[in-house]
Amino acid sequence: MIGTDENRAVLHVEVIFWSGKRKIPPSLVSGKYCPHFVVTGTTEYLGVCFLDGTECTFDTPALGNAQPLYPDTIDYAPLENNAEFLIYEGANAVGKGRVLGRTVPYKVKQQRKWVPYVPN
């Protein structure tokens, strides 16, 4: 699955950030919040970056879209639909979440380069 379009799928997630773990909730809309997801029952850190989402408040569900950061080197298959995960910043678990769905990037068909016909 590494390097495939399926591994590049944007993840639609529901997340909850716990109070007492951060001073303020993260901004999911800045495009700069890049935590790790660790799927329940595994230990592998899966780096993601939030593209957008709803405003976060502590201990309340928020919705967001996250993109895998390393689709060419790490297998993101464990983040399948309904997978539950913890959200880590470094070694600290700051929240939890669940995958609601995935959007695989649309494959764009290559256009043929037009070359004018030149008779001999």
What are the functions of these language-model segments?
Residues 1-120:
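C-terminal effector/interaction modules appended to NTPase cores
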